[in-house]
Each structure stands twice: as C-alpha cells, then as structure tokens.
Amino acid sequence: MPRRKDIRKVLVIGSGPIIIGQAAEFDYAGTQACKALREEGVSVVLVNSNPATIMTDLDIADQVYIEPLAWDSVAEIIARERPDGLLPTLGGQTGLNIAVELSEKGVLQDYGVELLGTPLESIKKAENRELFKNLMLEIGEPVPRSTIAGSVEECLAFAGEIGYPVIVRPAYTLGGTGGGIACREQELVEIAGRGLKMSMIGQVLLEQSVAGWKEIEYEVMRDGADNCITVCNMENVDPVGIHTGDSIVVAPSQTLSDKEYQLLRSAALRIIRALKVEGGCNVQFALDLNSMAYYVIEVNPRVSRSSALASKATGYPIAKVAAKIAVGLTLDEIKNPVTGKTYACFEPALDYVVVKIPRWPFDKFGSADRTLGTQMKATGEVMAIDRTFEGALMKAVRSLEIGVDGLHLPGSAGWSEMELEEKLSYPNDLRLFAIAEAFNRSWGMREVAQLTTIDYFYLSKIRGIVELERELQAAGPRPPRELLRRAKSCGLPDSLIGRLTGLPAREVHALRKEYGILPAFKIVDTCAAEFEAVTPYYYSTYDDEDEVAVSGRPKVLVLGSGPIRIGQGIEFDYCSVHSVWGLQQEGIEAVIINNNPETVSTDFDTADKLYFEPLTLEDVLNVIEKEKPLGVIVQFGGQTAINLTAGLAALGVNILGTPVEGIDAAEDRDKFEKLLTGLGIPQSEGRSAVNVEEAQAVAEKLGYPVLVRPSYVLGGRAMEIISSKTELVKYMTEAVQVSPRHPVLVDKYIRGKEVEVDAIGDGNDLFIPGIMEHIERAGVHSGDSIAVYPPQTLSREEIDKIVEYTLKIGRALKINGLINIQYVVDNGGVYVLEVNPRASRTVPVLSKVTGVPMVQAATRAMLGRSLAELGYRPGLGPVGGFIAVKAPVFSFEKLGLVEISLGPEMKSTGEVMGIDRSFPGALYKAMRAAGLKVASGGRVVFSVADRDKAEAVSIAGEYAALGYTLHATPGTARALEKAGLEVEVVEITDPVPLIRSGTVGLIINTPTRGKVPGRPGFLLRRTAAEYRVPCLTSLDTARALAMVLRSVRWGGEPAPVSMAELFEKEGTANCCLRKKDSKAAIF
C-alpha cells in the first residue's frame, strides 16, 4: 500500500523524564520515528517534557513543544496545531495513557485526529487486564488463573480461593509499578493497596504465580495488510518472578528447542494479529521447564525497553519501521537501511550472542531493598555482543562500571555459607556473582540450579569461566598460547588474566601480541552476512577474520557514557551525539564507542562508525589500535570517559580538548586550591584528608557543619553534610574507602544561593551561554535542585563576579571544550564550590534555551576553531525574553527503604523543563511535568526540624492564605500556633493510616536526626513516596510551590508555547539547528 496522503501532519508524544521503568529507549525510538516520518514528507509536531533528549532538538521535528505530558496540555497543542494523526506508541506508557485519556475526553473526535499505529481498542485490550485476559481466552492462548480486582477485599478473597503466592499487576502502569509477589495476607494488603492507587483506572490483576518458569520474549511487527514478522526472540536468564527490566537477557534464546521456539513464535504472531497492532509489539511468555506448557504473561502494544534491546541486538530499526507503518506503508515496501537491499519483511538472523545486564542504583542507595521482583528497580542497562555467551557475558559485566572486571566481587569470599545460600535463593543484584562464588567453592550444579531456578546451560557456562580462571592461576606468569586464546574467547580482560597469572595487564597485552592473539571486529548486519551491510556497526571477538574496512579519512573517537545511572544520565548521551555531529560538520569521520542499547548514540545511523564495546582501557585501546584516530574526546562521556583519561594519555593517546594537566588541576583538591588562591578567587574553606584522624582535625578547625565527599566522583556519590564528630567517624568508616590515592574532601558548609555556569573555551578564552540559579540553597545536589534560567534574584554585581571568576578559571586551566562551575552566593560574596572540566547535565537545557549548540561548538573548538571563528565573543551571552525552569524527577516509589530527603548526594533519575514568559508560569509547568500534583485545597502536613521552624511559620502562613488546612506534628504545631496560625495536631508514630486515608494533599518535612530508618520522620517520607503523596524536604521548594499555586489561582494556567515561536519572537530562530554542511549552525 502506498503512503497515506491524507496524513499530512502527525503529533508524536514523547515519554517525558527518565524514571525507573522508562528510560532513554524512548528518546532513541522517538528520534528515529520523527526522522522516518519526515522522510515520508509528513510534518511532525512533537511534545515532550524532557529537555535532555535529542528528540526535543529544534531540527528533529517541525514544531517542538517542551510542555507537561498531561492530557489537557496535549489537548491545547492539538487545538493549536490541528494534526491529522496522533502517534502515541513511541512515548512508552505515558504516551499510551495520554492517548486513552484524549479519546475518552472526546478531544480526538472533536478535532478529527486519527490514532495512528495501534488502534485505541487494541491499546485497551492490551493494557486493561480483564479485556486482555478475555481476548487471550477467545483466541485459545493460555493465561494464568486470575481475577480483576478493584479493592483490597476482592484481592484477599481471590488469594483465599487459590492460595499464596499471588502476583499483583496494576493496569496502565510502567515497569511493574505498584506490583509485586505476595506470599502472605499482610503483604497482599500492602501491595494491592499501593497498586490500586497507582493504576490509572484503579484496577489490578491478581494471578496465580508461575515464578520459577522460564521467561521468553518475542519482539514482533505487523503492518496494515496483516503481514507479520518476528524481529527477535529473547530469553531471560532469570526465571519468571523478576521483572524483565531487572533480568539478565540473552538474544537469541539459547536453551529453547526448535519446537519450543516455533510454538511461542506462532503464539506471538497470533496475539499481534488478534490485537490488530500496527507497528511493534512485545509479547512475554512463561514456559514450563519440564513440558511444552506455557502462559502468556503480558503484551506491550508499543515500542518498549525490550524493543530497543531487540533493535540494537539485531540492527533492525524497529521504531523507524513502526513509524512508517503508521502512515500506511507495509513491511514489503520499507527498505532496511542497514543492508540497503533487503526489505523490512525479512526476519533478522543473528550469528552472534547478545547479553543485556541491568544497571541498578544500589551503589547510590546502600539502605535500599536489593531484592528483585515484579517491580523494576534498574535505572539503566548495558548490552554486549560476542560470538560466545561467555564472551558477551564478561563484556557486559565490565560495562556495568561497578568496580569489577570479572565474576568475583570484592568481599564475596568472606560470605558465610548461609549468606551465599541466601543470595542464591532470593533474587538480587548480586546473584550472578553469588553463582560464581558457589562454583568457586565447588558447590554442585544441581544444588545451585535448585536454589536459583536458572537453566543448567547458563550455570554450566558460568562454572566454565570459574574453571578457566583456575587453569590460568595454575599456569603462572606465562600461560600457554592455547589457554590464553581460550581466556580471551571467553571474554576475560587482560587485567583479570594478569591478576590470575601474576602479570601486569600491559605484559598480558604484550604476550597476546607475541602469540598473535588479537581481537577481530565483526559487523552487525541483520542477516548473518547473507547480504552486505552498509551501516558500520561493529563488535569485537577473538576470531581470525576481521570485517572492518578502515578508511583513510581523518577521524576522531568519541567515548560514550555507558549505562544510565543516577548522576550520569541521558544528558551525556545527548552530548556524545552532538559531538559526533560537530565532527561531521568539520568533515571529520566520527567514531563512537558505547554499550547502552537504549540511546541515540548507539543508533545505526548516528556516527560514521559505531563500536558496541565496554568503556574500559583495554576495550577502548583495541578500537584505537584498529582505527588510529587523530585523537579521542572524553569530555562528553561523563565520569566514565574522564576516568579513562589518565590511562589513555599515559599510553600516548592524544586527548582532544582541555589538557590532561588542566583536568588534573581541576579534580585534584590541593592543586585546585593553589590555583584559586593564585587567581584571588574565594572558595569554601576546606582540605583533603586521607584518614579518619585527618578528617576530624580538618572538621574541628573549620567548625561543623562540614560538607564531605570523595574526590573524582559524579552525581555527588557518597557526599554528605556532617553535623558532628560521631557522624564524621561513621561516614569515614562506612560510606567511603579512603586512602592516600583516594582522599576525602572536607569543606566548610556555606548555606547560600547556588549558581551554575556552563562555558565553552577555545584554549584561550571562554564564552558563557547562560547562568542558572538554583531554587534550593547550597547543600542540595545540583542535579536534584530546581534551576532557573536566567537568574531571578542575583544582583548585577554578583553576576559580574561570576563571569569574571569563570573567565579567570577557564583561562588558567586552558579550557578547550566545555567547563561547568558551581558557585555559592552568600551575603554578596561569590565562592567556588566545584569545577568540572567536562560536559555537565545542564548542557542540553542551556543549549535549548539559549539557542547555542554548545557541544558542537565545543567539539569544533577542540579541532582548533577559535571562539571568533565560531561567532562568539568572550564573556556572557545575551539573555532571551523567556524563563526556563529545570526540575528533577525521582523514582522513590520503586526503591523501598531509600531515604527521600534531599542532600548533597544526587537521587533524581531524570528531569523536566518548563518554559514560559513568566517565572511562575515556567515553574508551574516544570512542577507539573515533574508529577507534583497538589489539590487546590485540603490538608497540608508540616513536620520540620527545630532549625527550620521559624522559616516554616511564614511558609505555612502562605498555604493557609491559599485556603489549605494546616496540620502539624506537636513540636511544629506549637511554633505555628505561637505565630497565630490555626493548626490541627497530628501524630506520625505510624504515618500509614494518615497517608492511606487519602485526605493529605501535601507533606512538608525536614529531617531532624539524619536519615535513620525506623524513625517517624523517615517512615513519613517513605510512606508518602510509596503512596504518591507529594513530600517536600526543602523549605525553598515548599515556598516556590506556594508561589506557583498563588499565581495559577489568580492568573490561570499558562498556555503551551512551541520552541520555534519563542525563538522567533526573540529574533534567534533556528540558531541551534544542526546543519552538516556549513558554519550556519553557529553564526
């Protein structure tokens, strides 16, 4: 069928901020789809609230709206833009839910907007648990015994009938949100109560547990002519009972017989046909280990995390094909861009193995419940490709960046037999390492299989790696050639082989070269080499034949940022992609290394060459030796890439941008202090300490409170405000591993206004596109603060000082590329808090709101362009006539036992932006986009520490004036009553009944005695997170929210506005567009 000519304009809904369960895969999918639609001559209108995405760049769609993802906001955009069609299936669960609401509210019908891709009825049948169950039974597909419940009482009745355990699955939710496995009545009451609240329609599916069965996924495609194909089948190493986003996944499946494979493939195709999905669809099955019995667990009628993995695993561009199907094309009409010859109706074939391992945030949250179940907890994932399962597994493990290069965790040898058995029996993030430890202790295969319910195939492979390590240990410092080749084929890195044999890693490398054991690079081509591929997408393996053709063009290697984790998110992938575009603008061949299957940087057509590899010194050097680039760019890959700088430089690799000495001077505390003193720039007083005694001495001299943190970290990991000697000793002995090589920094804590600057340097001078002011005072991590552009409360003198200090620091460090500096402003004084000689998470926001393509400009500066050549003058850039507010987004409800109060260690998983002509309007949009829903009236509960009571009085007065009823804990209530406010006293010894009552609209709580689990304040905050009641732990945020509520009450809600409209009114339209052919992108 030819493309439909009646579809001229399409509205695409993005997925919003990165949260657990919905990450960068939707930026990749949305970007690919927007480009595909425009290739077909369709005008694209995009709405998304996430400024850190490539898809919200001005040249990805014809009109870009960075607005809250709520049905009424999208309805206003529909009224303005009048699209012919709406494509919601690229926006994750958020996009589907909005589409359903728009239809139910009559918006789509009123404006004649057609839902493209998957019909509304199909979405409802897949998402509504009862309709889905009925459809499966109609077509003869088996589903576990289940019931639909709208109350806790109904859940208890069903569980009483079929027995425990039971699985709770809320309708219309993401990443298993609110779900879980209940093994007893009390657990069911808690899980079902939470799940009902989190479901958009107040409905949960209660089903018999098939935990322990094998979990298999099929990614399938269907077009409007009912042509269907299977793109990829994937096998979860972990059994049913663990969310697939928290499972190790292998593609293609390794343990299915052909009969089982075909049985489930046929079922997947029957299901996509019955649902009438047009586009991509993910089907999940539970397969009995001992028979051919299976159940259908779930269907996602949209692009998903699994489809991103399937797409990167096979090279098949699922999102692109889905977008073209949505406008009428069929699979046999859509050319596969990977081969340039075959069509999308050809099923991909794989001649390699892909392994995905989730990246969990437990290194950030030591107190979190690490048990894995049906509710997802991972923030991101890594993917690895090799010719063997072992090779792919070991690559994936070292891609995680968790301080290990193999299957042995530091400290695992010290686990008792009982601890080890517990780690094997109860799924958790350490189970892979526990399996290796069990085999290391010569536990039997049968025993490990019974405890884990993991297939013998995978266990035998892990045991094989452990036995190989023993052979290497026995071989000594010169292992024989065949043993070394076997070790490299199984994915063991030189560093691990070196430790086992007693050789330094460089000597292992030299021995490999002597033996002729070198990696070969293979191409991902979707067709197992049946057709020649035209897209350069490679992986390494220890094989004789190499498939990479190295060009004679000048080339530069960009290091990506690896898996998404707290502190290092999608912002750095945005920067990596823009760096690639900057290189291409200059006619340089752009080569990128990354291992994250969710991102735009690992899409088949982003860079000139993509290497899907771990970001370790050995793996990066393999690519450098192959490609021989002019230099390597490390600035845009977050701490992942920065940490490789010294090792690469020591081996003679040319690091482009800021000199290594400049990076070291900024990161090394003592060197940096001397630099600032020499420049006459004040900073918060502090010292480094290499042991507990030194830290105590520094803290005593400075006076408490002090801010402590390790050096060379990102996202404020292990950073804390310490108020006493006892807290300091606890921190030094438990939170960090301090040593002369890894000192701890101890600073005097200044509680002023925090300000953030990003600047572009050419090695001599700096251009500052903009300054951002934080709403929360210093002490809250910049990634968790609400930030405003341009600053709203700084004086001219303070801004001038910030600009002066930034220029001085940049010149002294010879910044070439990007630099991020954080300041604290206190009583007119400006103090340097931190300097990062690299891209920061605010770069995408500033690029979008100033119109300055910061990363492209920085990349071109690294290639020798001066600021003048790029069209910039040193100093601060002009300020536009609108306000932008960046707000953090958290995923606390997914992580049990995690403290939600804000501090110097970053906790947010994503961010949103609000943009408007007024500050209250922009702040309202940002808060709404972040999911802060506060009723226009009702109860506000105050419970604040003694130090905050005086300030809380005025804030409580503002909420009272807005008509809210004040409630407070006894101590806080006394302070409010003393100020003449009417307040009702509440006790929070057990906060669950209060919050579960549904009468509390907002909680304002500041911690008193640290963050101790079990204390009433901690329980109040945790319960609020789990029941989605807004809980603010910063009085600055509470005051800002009161201002927003007042503004909306008197002035109404601000209207949506497109980015192009804002820039046109400023006379700067299109100044941040990407153009490959000229300098017009910058002038």
Curated annotation (Swiss-Prot):
Pathway membership, UniProt: Amino-acid biosynthesis; L-arginine biosynthesis; carbamoyl phosphate from bicarbonate: step 1/1; Pyrimidine metabolism; UMP biosynthesis via de novo pathway; (S)-dihydroorotate from bicarbonate: step 1/3
Chain positions covered by the region annotation Carboxyphosphate synthetic domain: 1-401
Enzyme Commission designation: 6.3.4.16, 6.3.5.5
Gene (name only): carB
InterPro entries xref list: ATP-grasp (IPR011761), CarbamoylP_synth_lsu (IPR006275), CarbamoylP_synth_lsu_oligo (IPR005480), CarbamoylP_synth_lsu_oligo_sf (IPR036897), CbamoylP_synth_lsu-like_ATP-bd (IPR005479), CbamoylP_synth_lsu_CPSase_dom (IPR005483), MGS-like_dom (IPR011607), MGS-like_dom_sf (IPR036914)
Residues reported to bind Mg(2+) 4: 834, 836
CC cofactor: Mg(2+); Mn(2+)
Family: Belongs to the CarB family.
Cofactor: record remark: Binds 4 Mg(2+) or Mn(2+) ions per subunit.
Residue ranges of every copy of the MGS-like domain listed in the record: 932-1069
Binding site for Mn(2+) 1: 284, 298
Binding, Mg(2+) 2: 298, 300
Residues annotated for Mg(2+) 3 binding in this entry: 822, 834
Protein's recorded name: Carbamoyl phosphate synthase large chain
Region feature Carbamoyl phosphate synthetic domain, mapped onto this chain: 549-931
Binding annotation for Mg(2+) 1: 284, 298
Family matches, as Gene3D superfamilies: 3.40.50.20, ATP-grasp fold, B domain, Carbamoyl-phosphate synthetase, large subunit oligomerisation domain, Methylglyoxal synthase-like domain
Subunit structure: Composed of two chains; the small (or glutamine) chain promotes the hydrolysis of glutamine to ammonia, which is used by the large (or ammonia) chain to synthesize carbamoyl phosphate. Tetramer of heterodimers (alpha,beta)4.
Keywords: Amino-acid biosynthesis, Arginine biosynthesis, ATP-binding, Ligase, Magnesium, Manganese, Metal-binding, Nucleotide-binding, Pyrimidine biosynthesis, Repeat
One annotated GO biological process: L-arginine biosynthetic process
Residues that hold Mn(2+) 4 according to the record: 834, 836
Pfam (any one): CPSase_L_D3
Keyword Ligase found: yes
Reactions the enzyme catalyzes: hydrogencarbonate + L-glutamine + 2 ATP + H2O = carbamoyl phosphate + L-glutamate + 2 ADP + phosphate + 2 H(+)
